[in-house]
Design a protein with these regions (language model features):
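A cross-kingdom feature that marks ATP-driven nucleic-acid transaction machinery
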Residues: 1-17, 27, 53-54, 66, ...
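Interdomain hinge/linker elements that couple catalytic modules in large macromolecular machines
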Residues: 2-7, 151, 158-303, 307
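Hydrophobic anchor at the beta1->P-loop junction of P-loop NTPases
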Residues: 36
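Conserved lysine of the Walker
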Residues: 44-45
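Short glycine-rich substrate-engagement loop in P-loop NTPases that contacts/grips substrate
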Residues: 58-90
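Structural recognition of the conserved hydrophobic beta-strand(s) that form the central parallel beta-sheet
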Residues: 117-123, 144
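Short regulatory helix/loop adjacent to the ATP-binding pocket of P-loop NTPases
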Residues: 126-141, 157-158
Length: 391
């Protein structure tokens, strides 16, 4: 344990606290068992270390990574017990999905060490169902950490302190932006290519992001789904087929034939890609379980992934719709619209470029046109970048 403590202290010393994502404040850190999930690279590890550094009694806290060599010969439960017996009160376990059988041991810690608070993080939601097998779903409070919003990107890259905006504020054009000396469209276009992840300023950003995407498809999902090598190859092929066709309107019969897959198996593969955070599914509004519905369209999660996969020649309309859905889905229930592109709380949204008109939303009870090359909101026409201030 001493080596783990030394590694923890070193990581803590190297953790910056100049900027902490506002997502931190959405978490109730007083809960006994907290799960923080999200894509690789969105900043889960940094946020956890920042929380410890800023709010915890360091002598009573321990942060470990589940893929540490220490766990090749030690159980997480045994570490938790030894740490608790030494006076430990808060244990943070990062990359929990990399530890085989983690869900069972987390349940043991929760049940047998009731005075020890536990926070775990995972790079995706891939192990959610496995955790449920150990009844974790009734014990843990889980949070999903999204990509950086446009607002967060500006605050980090420009050292600003811009505030979030509600959907109503955005629809009325009330956004906290320093128009006097700065142009939002310029920064928005930068963000589209490399602004969705906290390491956007690193020189090899695109390479790292592509590696993270491929690792999710080649390693994380196959491990979760207990796939054969042949099946994992088909999953990777499916991912690239979908990525090159977004927004993709699923035709299960054609896809299954092209991949030599059972039509009954294909929905599971698409579900894995959605749960991994790489894709977002747009569905019709339903009174039943929406997750069981076949998606109307599939989008990559964000435009940075589009560029990282070398799909930068994608239609501008695809990128617009991708980011509108990516931002709004974290704060609102978003559905496909029967007369236009999207529907949120009964409001219809048509997403387009400078020449987009409101023709398609004329029959909507309440509708807005969302454009990507304007700076100001005028009437029911809203700049798309403003939706990047929702969180």
């Amino acid at each position: 344990m001493e080596a783990l403590l030394q590694s923890f202290r070193m990581r803590l010393d190297l953790t910056p606290t100049a900027y902490v994502r506002s997502f931190h404040d959405t978490i109730n850190w007083n809960n006994r068992l907290i799960g923080i999930l999200g894509q690789k690279g969105v900043g889960k590890s940094t946020m956890i270390l920042q929380h410890i550094k800023m709010y915890d009694d360091i002598s009573e806290s321990l942060y470990v990574q589940a893929d540490d060599f220490y766990f090749a010969s030690h159980r997480i439960y045994d570490l938790a017990l030894a740490f608790f017996q030494r006076g430990g009160k808060k244990l943070y376990i990062d990359e929990i999905h990399k530890y085989s059988g983690w869900n069972t041991e987390i349940k043991m810690i929760y049940d047998q060490l009731p005075l020890l608070k536990l926070v775990y993080s995972g790079s995706s939601v891939l192990d959610l169902k496995k955790g449920a097998k150990a009844d974790l779903s009734r014990r843990t409070i889980e949070y999903f950490m999204p990509i950086l919003s446009f607002r967060e990107y500006l605050n980090i890259s420009k050292a600003w302190n811009l505030k979030t905006a509600s959907l109503d504020e955005i629809l009325s054009g009330h956004i906290d932006f320093p128009y006097g000396e700065h142009r939002p469209i310029k920064y928005y276009k930068e963000y589209l290519q490399r602004g969705c992840y906290p390491y956007f300023s690193e020189e090899d950003f695109i390479i790292k992001l592509k590696q993270a995407v491929i690792a999710t498809v080649e390693d994380d999902i196959p491990k979760y789904a207990e796939m054969t090598v042949a099946a994992s190859v088909k999953l990777k092929k499916l991912m690239f087929m979908l990525a090159q066709s977004v927004p993709y309107k699923p035709n299960y019969t054609t896809l299954a034939r092209d991949l030599d897959l059972s039509r009954n198996t294909l929905p599971d593969y698409i579900d894995y890609l959605e749960k991994s955070g790489l894709f977002n599914a747009l569905r019709e509004k339903s009174t039943g379980d929406g997750l069981l519905q076949k998606p109307e369209k599939l989008y990559l999660d964000n435009s940075n992934i589009i560029y990282a996969l070398g799909l930068d020649k994608s239609d501008a309309g695809t990128i617009r719709e991708t980011m509108f859905l990516s931002w709004t889905r974290h704060m609102c229930a978003v559905y496909s619209s029967k007369i236009s592109d999207f529907e949120i709380d009964g409001i219809t949204f048509e997403v387009g470029g400078r020449n987009k008109t409101g023709r398609q939303i004329k029959s909507a009870e309440r509708g807005f046109v969302v454009k990507d090359d304007i700076e100001y909101a005028v009437g029911n026409t809203i700049p798309i970048w403003m939706f990047g201030f929702l969180y």
